[in-house]
Amino acid sequence: MKSIPIKKRWGQNFINDKNLIDKIISVFDPDKKDTVLEIGPGKGALTYPLSKRVKKIIAVEIDPILVSHLKENFIENIELINDDILRFKHTSIKKGYKIIGNL
């Protein structure tokens, strides 16, 4: 994986610990029927393993470089949106979604 610099202005931090990722997913308790809104997927460390356990992930990432990186590793049930979550029109998503983020 190519090196992607952390941008402090967006408060970026990237999870690298697989045990922590597994713990977050376990506590989140995903279901195959779930639609998940992920805030700040970053490099996809949480996104990709979670995508195997839910119906769909809508991942909103502000950093266009990270969006490009995520698109290189396309997975069908992940919808990537390059936007600021504070401006994102979440009403465009059907009701009943869950929210996750490594903030």
Located regions from the model:
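Catalytic cores of RNA-modifying enzymes
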Residues: M1-L103
